[in-house]
Amino acid sequence: MFRSNARALNRALERLKNVQTKVNEALKRSGIQEKSLERKLRIWLRKVEENVPLGELILEKRSSCAIWLSDKDVEILEKVKRLEEQGQDLIKKISVNKSSREIVERVLGPSFHPQKTALEMLDKLKDCLKKKNVQKIGVWGMGGVGKTTLVRTLNNDLLKYAATQQFALVIWVTVSKDFDLKRVQMDIAKRLGKRFTREQMNQLGLTICERLIDLKNFLLILDDVWHPIDLDQLGIPLALERSKDSKVVLTSRRLEVCQQMMTNENIKVACLQEKEAWELFCHNVGEVANSDNVKPIAKDVSHECCGLPLAIITIGRTLRGKPQVEVWKHTLNLLKRSAPSIDTEEKIFGTLKLSYDFLQDNMKSCFLFCALFPEDYSIKVSELIMYWVAEGLLDGQHHYEDMMNEGVTLVERLKDSCLLEDGDSCDTVKMHDVVRDFAIWFMSSQGEGFHSLVMAGRGLIEFPQDKFVSSVQRVSLMANKLERLPNNVIEGVETLVLLLQGNSHVKEVPNGFLQAFPNLRILDLSGVRIRTLPDSFSNLHSLRSLVLRNCKKLRNLPSLESLVKLQFLDLHESAIRELPRGLEALSSLRYICVSNTYQLQSIPAGTILQLSSLEVLDMAGSAYSWGIKGEEREGQATLDEVTCLPHLQFLAIKLLDVLSFSYEFDSLTKRLTKFQFLFSPIRSVSPPGTGEGCLAISDVNVSNASIGWLLQHVTSLDLNYCEGLNGMFENLVTKSKSSFVAMKALSIHYFPSLSLASGCESQLDLFPNLEELSLDNVNLESIGELNGFLGMRLQKLKLLQVSGCRQLKRLFSDQILAGTLPNLQEIKVVSCLRLEELFNFSSVPVDFCAESLLPKLTVIKLKYLPQLRSLCNDRVVLESLEHLEVESCESLKNLPFVPGNTGMINEQMAWEYMSRTLG
């Protein structure tokens, strides 16, 4: 008995000491700032330090006399076991500092191909991060060699091990050629979770410095640095003792930049050796590179790429799937022809030109257009496509949807050729800076049809008149600091495209300025502070696209009557009070955006009716309310005009009352590919969502509303502060003969008296395909009540958001039978003051597989739930849970983890939980 107990105690002590070491390491790595939180973790460590010597003393004393352990000794053994279990829980289930989503953010873009040289450079970079005497690391090499790819891979590798890597925070900032101190500081501040007023802008560096000092150890990655940066001015406190474990990694094309920034280590990213270059080339070309006929030529083509990864990837993808020997020989000849007289940096332009030459003619111009935007700029794809159509690069005869589909296809082909890449947000693209440099070089060096002036994002204060020549076809001066536009520019300019958006200091467009551009097809003045446009604007007879987004002082425009070729008109968030005069004469106009025009009050009757080509009418968030027969305002357009537009595909409008929107408009709704309808008498209401069929009803009595016909087309329904919801739902339950299968999202805000008439319960699931459900201030004790109320089975539900439901005691209980939440992925619950638990499936049969109750639930976020005692009973196993955030839930006693979970809990929850469970 003694030997057995002694061995058990010895094993338990060894395990506990191992866990103690891991916790100490985690505490050291985490960089925890709040002393109270740090003290609570040390509670566990102190108990370990108290009990380990006691256990060792027992073993020492008992080894000399073979007697059984006393009851007191057995208590020590049990205490050691408990401490070991608690420690294991801390290591496995609690992210000691922050969730991985906070410590490291994923940087989008390709990782490098896993080759020996690349992996060695990555290992070398990681080794530098571990060296105590190394704070600043330079990564340098020519453009296109893979510097950004290397540090991006480092960043994303750190994300994989965010909870255990050495830094409290990893910050990624793209600097770019046109360095802007304030912009870089704002990017860092955003990563730190800081927002600033204009008055605080002058203190950005100081505020960043103070926050970084608190972090103790951080990693700052500065990508694409062209000129030395004063880190002290930026707000980076590397010189302080408290930040001695912090690091800065920068990438640059020039070693001189790294040296002037006093880097401790510099890593050169060189071109690939022949063998690895061939491997990367084959990876991108595919099997055709090793075919008998092609391989000898392919070897030579690979050699001509000079080991430069960007060239290898670009050329490789251009030739992918092309087995014709003639194509390969032609490619090789083109590469060799440019080789003798140009250096390596220009060599990449030769390889990129080869990829460019393989493009179809319209794709070439579309590709070059992308270079008009500033470096590292994320271009919205839909806006890019409209530019292309307006300039005549894409067929403008297609319907709007077909036009967008063609444009997206072209974008994807350019991405497949490595000439474009994904932008920083959804549905955006951008150019690699080397590819953009090539495009600008090509446009500035070519003759008729290509000549462009690109000075976007250069910080220009004065208009560069000396750069203008009559042959320039595209001009991009966007995102500068121009203070004024000249009254006179060189005469006879052939410019088709003039992009001036983002010059917020410009207050006026002189009359003579636009006279210099009689052939304009595209004019973009978004974000300038103009109140109107000059009379000469009316002479732009070739204009096809006029973009005046975010011109918040723009009150009116000259008559548009003479702009007979205009196709796209964008006045988003302008201050116009009525639609421009002469609009009714524009028979070619196919796109109007007046969204978020909060002062728009007038659309004269008959104006819209004349726009026979109109396909998109976007008035989301506009103050104008469309009337229907019987409620129209005198002299104002009504919805009946819209129904007469034969080509309309997208419609976003606001109407006063849903009751008058009857089945007679069903034919209109059916032929729309996308719509956003808002019904509200209130002038300023947020527009509905951005899905295919969005319906929002706000501050309306809907007790007599019969909208079943409309819900057949709706994908997203938002009900805000509506009276009579019980009556509307009763109508749906009693009159609906089929489910609303299109509905994917339902949001209800303020429904304090939810109740149906006796016996009025739906026998079918009204929303069988619902994926998102949001409830705010709804009178429910359990979400399960919706089962009987609307027949909602929630079998497709992925996201559930609940807030302010004061009667809610549990989310799901036996009213939702086991197995009906197979797709639920995320739950967010806020300010439900009576909520006691999330799940209670106590009546589920004992032999039922617990793991199948919520098989896909990965994220739970809980906030301000004072009565919440538990998340679930013992029957529920949250096998897939990955992320748990808990804030201000004082009564919560247990957490739903199982072996293998990697619980990512925010630090406030972690410490509150530890202080309760560890005593």
UniProtKB/Swiss-Prot annotation:
What Pfam families does the annotation carry? Answer: LRR_14, LRR_RPS2, NB-ARC, WH_DRP
Task: Determine if Transferase is one of this entry's keywords.
Answer: no
Which residue stretches, if any, does this entry annotate as coiled coil?
Answer: 1-30, 74-95
Task: Quote one Gene Ontology molecular function term.
Answer: ATP binding
The record's listing under SMART domains reads:
LRR_TYP
Biological process GO terms, please? Answer: defense response
Ordered alphabetically, the record's keywords are:
ATP-binding, Coiled coil, Leucine-rich repeat, Nucleotide-binding, Plant defense, Repeat
- The record lists ATP as bound by G141, M142, G143, G144, V145, G146, K147, T148
What positions does the domain NB-ARC occupy? 121-399
Residue ranges of the LRR repeats are 447-468, 469-492, 494-516, 519-540, 542-564, 565-587, 588-610, 611-635
Give a short account of what the protein does: Probable disease resistance protein.
Domain writeup: The LRR repeats probably act as specificity determinant of pathogen recognition.
Q: Which family does the record claim for this protein?
A: Belongs to the disease resistance NB-LRR family.
Listed name of the protein: Probable disease resistance protein At4g27220
What's the source species for this entry? Arabidopsis thaliana (Mouse-ear cress)
Q: What is the lineage of its organism?
A: Eukaryota, Viridiplantae, Streptophyta, Embryophyta, Tracheophyta
